[in-house]
Every structure is written in C-alpha cells, then in structure tokens.
Amino acid sequence: MFKFHLITKDGKARRGRIYTPHGVIETPVFMPVGTQGTVKAMLHKLLDEIGTQIILGNTYHLYLRPGTEIIKKAGGLHRFISWNKPILTDSGGYQVFSLAKGKFGNRKAKVKVSDEGVEFQDHLQGDKHFFTPEKVVEIQEIFGSDIMMPLDECVEYPVDKNYAEKALKRTINWLERSIKAKKREDQVLFGIVQGAFWKDLRKKAVEETLKFDEFLFGYSIGGLSVGEPKEIMYGMTEVVCELLPEKKPRYLMGVGKPEDILEAVERGVDMFDCVVPTRNARTGTLYTSQGVVDIRHSKWKEDFSPLDPECDCYTCRNFSKAYLRHLFVAEEISAYVLNTIHNLRFYLKMMEEVRKAIEEKRFKELKEKYLQRVKNKL
C-alpha cells in the first residue's frame, strides 16, 4: 500500500517516488499548506491544474475547528474537504508551542509542557486543552490522512543546550508512545528528528529515532527555520541526512523559501512544506523567471506584459502586471487568488524541473539558475 522507491541520485540530491492509497507522489515534492482544510485563496480544481500532488493539513487548527467529531461524521478529512489525493497532517505541536509566543491571535497563551504532554489555551476562545502523543495520533486517525506526524517538542532559537537535550529526549519518548497508540494500517507515521542547533544532539536524535525504524515510513527534520542563521539550518540538515536511511523519504518541516529548498535538495531532502508562496502571494510578492516582483509598486502601473512570460499558469496566460497591480491595490479578492495560483505554480514547476535535472545529472546547474532568479528583485 505504501512504498518509497529511490529512482536515482545526482550527488546527494535524490529522485524518488512515494506510493500511497490516494496516489503516487513524485519527489522531491513541495506540499502546499492547507492549514484549515483548504489552501488559502485556492480551490481544489486550481490546485489540480497547477500540478499539486499532496497537501498538508494542520492537526491543531482542524481539531479546534471544525473539530474531530464533524470530520469523523463526514467520513474523514479526504471526504470532508473533497480531496482525493494524498494528505499529510502535522501533529499540531509547532502551533501549540507557538501559542506561548503570541503567534496566533492578539495575546500570548499559557503553554505547559510535561513528559505527559502539552497543556495549552487555544487562540479562539482561550479554552484549555491537553495534547498527549496518544491523543494526537487518535485525532489524525480520525482524519485519515495518509502521512501522520507524532507529537514533538520544537524549541526556539536561541535555546539553552541542556533544555534542547531534554526536549530531544521528550520527543523520542513521545515517538515511542505514538507508535504504540497507532492502530490504522492505511496510514503511516514519520519519526521527527529534533536536536536544535548542535551537531552532537542532532546525531543523538537520529540514533535514538532509528531505534524505531521498523515502525516508521520516513523521517522528518524538525526544529529548523525558527530564526537561526541559514548556515546553521543547512548544516543541521546535512548532518541529519548523512545519517538517515537511504531507502526512506526525508521531510524538512516548514522550510520553503526557494533557495532553502534547493540547498536542502542538494543535501538529500525529499519533501517540503511552507506558507511562504501563499503568504507572499497575499502580500504582493511574486516569484518569476526574471526575478521577484513586488506587484504593489507603481512601476507596474502601465506594464501590460504578462507577469512571467515563461510561466504556464492561468494568471500569466491571461493577465498583465498592470491588471494584477490594479486588483491588488483595489483590494479585490481575485488578486489573492491570481497571485496564489502563480506563486504555487512557480514552486511546483521548480520542483518538476528539479526532478528532471536530478534524472539528467544536472541539478547543480539548475540550482544556480534558480538562485539567480530569487536574488534578483525587480
């Protein structure tokens, strides 16, 4: 039912294929983020048209609203949202730990972490909840996502090394409990490698996580892209990838700027998710083959050329920069839709080209081409 096939490599960059009950995923893959059962400003039909293979759902947000009972009555998340391709759900842990920093809503919430689990107040009503590894698995089994994540403790940057080691041990303990709690055969679980920003802790995290290898379909690299310098992010990714099993998929959680994806692919990562393309679309920052466009700028006011002449998306085939700027400045809802179609297509097309380049052993050349594109601010 589930299988990962490593097709070929170019250096450490990997070209693979994941088989799931809801379809095949060609890797390396970018997964658009559908936090609340939808990718913001997109319809499923549009996601299909631009080549989306898999979307990500968020356990924390879906647990709060609409709630597990409604999704259960609907027959699972695929049926509830009418999406027949693969879905990956995260554990909600990152969101829960982010509550303490006031990342949702207008206030900071109380978050208490213990070896048992995490107690928190939600950002909607301020109600108290308690997530344990068992509960998080139970929620995701109700959702019926293809790929599940266990509860883990994600630390911030900077962090005390002693605490980072404590969080690592807790994450391993929670993984063991998640494996014991898992019942469904038609879903798979990834192990999450923490260890913060120290090579020795990352190595220890891999060693401890690998003890459960027979129960895990793949491995996630967590706790990065939380404010640390790029060289640390790339360094930790490299350390972990060198130690992970060759024949299982690797997922770098929450990392999604184009340059970061390319650097991680070069180090051996297969899967990515991030809100960057969709969030940037809603703030007017658009990626093109010529460079990055700020569509709000008055310089596009009378530019009647396509946003990106090399792009095959609906937006670029039909509309000019001048019109897209007008829609954005006028705060028309269609501006968010058209911008999001384009940014996601840029990402998905980039991944298509990455896969082809790995097959043809020219990944480094393609990487340099894209790095020049994203450095160029138009």
From Swiss-Prot:
Species name: Aquifex aeolicus (strain VF5)
Catalytic activity: 7-aminomethyl-7-carbaguanine + guanosine(34) in tRNA = 7-aminomethyl-7-carbaguanosine(34) in tRNA + guanine
Pathway membership, UniProt: tRNA modification; tRNA-queuosine biosynthesis
A GO molecular-function descriptor: metal ion binding
GO cellular component entries: cytoplasm; cytosol
Binding-site residues for Zn(2+), renumbered to this chain: C311, C313, C316, H342
Active site: D90 (proton acceptor), D273 (nucleophile)
Enzyme Commission code(s) on record: 2.4.2.29
SUPFAM superfamilies: tRNA-guanine transglycosylase
Note describing how the cofactor binds: Binds 1 zinc ion per subunit.
Protein name in the entry: Queuine tRNA-ribosyltransferase
UniProt keyword list: Glycosyltransferase, Metal-binding, Queuosine biosynthesis, Transferase, tRNA processing, Zinc
HAMAP family per UniProt: Q_tRNA_Tgt
InterPro entries: ArchSynthase1/Queuine_TRR (IPR050076), TGT (IPR004803), TGT-like_sf (IPR036511), tRNA_ribo_trans-like (IPR002616)
Gene name for this UniProt entry: tgt
Single GO BP term: tRNA wobble guanine modification
Bridged cysteine pairs (disulfide): none
Residues binding substrate, per UniProt: D90, S91, G92, G93, Y94, D152, Q194, G223
